[in-house]
Design a protein with these regions (language model features):
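Class I S-adenosyl-L-methionine-dependent methyltransferase catalytic core
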Residues: 1-160
Length: 160
């Protein structure tokens, strides 16, 4: 995680009014990291009720209102969300059948602001180099991250 955030600081200043979305947030470690790095707003989406409750409890303990935990299905959230974010992180289960659709859904629904960064954590067998928004791929041990960027030339406005 530390290595990833070191890379991300080349692209984003988390203390400069950044809004973030943490998808498949699990126990909320990325959401907590984003709040601690100065994000103005973090929406944390997790389906599991125990994980969601844990995130709520941690945010209460650290006395922050900068994280908004949402319990729900990530794909439904993506379809219904009308906000845009500077930074999106997704850590879906590696065996998720439609994992490879996540980047196109993020861009189709216009969730990322222009020049925003989307990071997808995934297994070694997923490849996204042909995606028009692909920036770079990083791997740290068995963990793989692909970074995507929203650019004005590559993006189509979301269809309603």
């Amino acid at each position: 995680k530390e290595n990833l955030f070191n890379v991300l600081t080349n692209y984003l200043d988390f203390e400069d009014g950044v809004s973030a979305l943490d998808l498949f947030s699990g126990t909320g470690s990325i959401s907590i990291e984003l709040v601690s790095r100065g994000c103005d707003k973090v929406i944390s989406v997790e389906k599991d009720p125990q994980h969601h409750a844990f995130i709520c409890q941690v945010m209460k303990e650290v006395k922050t209102d900068k994280c908004i935990p949402i319990r729900g299905d990530v794909f439904r959230f993506i379809e219904r969300c009308h906000e845009q974010f500077d930074f999106i992180f997704a850590d879906p289960p590696y065996a998720l059948p439609n994992l490879e659709e996540i980047p196109s859904l993020i861009f189709k629904h216009g969730l990322l602001k222009e020049d925003g960064i989307f990071v997808l954590e995934h297994g070694k067998d997923n490849h996204f180099e042909d995606d028009p928004h692909f920036m770079e791929h990083r791997h740290y041990g068995s963990v793989n991250f692909t970074l995507f960027r929203a650019t004005a030339t590559a993006d189509e406005p979301p269809t309603l």
